[in-house]
């Protein structure tokens, strides 16, 4: 079987689902002698809802997680992944990779499993909806108002268009991106090359 990243992602999601998890992203770095496969996971929506109930005090027992919602943080914005989750997923998925020979020609490879982190990538419409109101930095395929690099607060979606509030970043004086005279900019989701959250600590 030839190496196929989509096949690997699909296999990873099968394993993740059996653990109450979702695959957020898959990254691959290949070389002649060594390969690196990174899988980013989080609790699925049902499990995140349970953790949100725990953090609000509605459930007495709270498990220790890599990312629990801080005070004032939207509970939908954390992954809820534990080290035990990563370890269990890594064991099961590593076995599947070898049994189904999904890493052909790789005599050695490293499988790295972790949460997506506070600076996670946004890759789907659901991500933009879930993290509405968050700070984000993004780049576009084609320039918007003469600029391909933007930072701002996501003000919501209008159809397939993302509205970005630029005033938050101007007030903080962050970033070296070209400034726009406008306070908001509209960017088509299909024009977004890469988008990533900016942690607010």
From Swiss-Prot:
Provide the protein's localization. Cytoplasm
Q: Which Pfam families match?
A: DUF150_C, RimP_N
What InterPro entries does the database record attribute to this sequence? Ribosome_maturation_RimP, RimP_C, RimP_C_sf, RimP_N, RimP_N_sf
Task: Please give a single GO biological process term from the UniProt record.
Answer: ribosomal small subunit assembly
Superkingdom of origin? Bacteria
Which Gene Ontology cellular component annotation is one that this UniProt entry carries? cytosol
Q: Which UniProt keywords apply?
A: Cytoplasm, Ribosome biogenesis
**Family matches, as HAMAP family:** RimP
Query: What role does it play?
Result: Required for maturation of 30S ribosomal subunits.
Its family remark reads: Belongs to the RimP family.
Supply the name of the protein: Ribosome maturation factor RimP
Species of origin: Acidobacterium capsulatum (strain ATCC 51196 / DSM 11244 / BCRC 80197 / JCM 7670 / NBRC 15755 / NCIMB 13165 / 161)
């Amino acid at each position: 079987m030839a190496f196929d990243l989509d096949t690997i992602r699909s296999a990873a999601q099968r394993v993740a689902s059996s653990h109450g998890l979702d695959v957020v992203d898959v990254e691959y770095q290949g070389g002649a002698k060594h390969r690196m496969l990174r899988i980013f996971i989080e609790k699925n929506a049902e499990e995140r809802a349970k953790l949100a109930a725990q953090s609000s005090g509605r459930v007495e027992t709270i498990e220790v997680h890599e990312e629990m919602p801080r005070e004032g943080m939207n509970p939908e914005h954390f992954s809820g992944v534990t080290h035990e989750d990563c370890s269990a997923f890594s064991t099961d998925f590593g076995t599947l990779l070898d049994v189904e020979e999904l890493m052909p020609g790789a005599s050695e490879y490293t499988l790295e499993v972790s949460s997506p982190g506070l600076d996670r990538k946004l890759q789907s419409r659901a991500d933009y909806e879930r993290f509405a109101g968050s700070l984000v930095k993004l780049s576009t395929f084609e320039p918007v108002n003469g600029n391909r690099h933007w930072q701002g607060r996501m003000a919501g979606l209008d159809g397939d268009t993302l509205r970005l509030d630029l005033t938050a970043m101007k007030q903080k004086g962050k970033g070296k991106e070209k400034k726009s005279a406008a306070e908001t900019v509209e960017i088509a989701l299909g024009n977004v090359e890469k988008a990533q959250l900016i942690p607010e600590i």
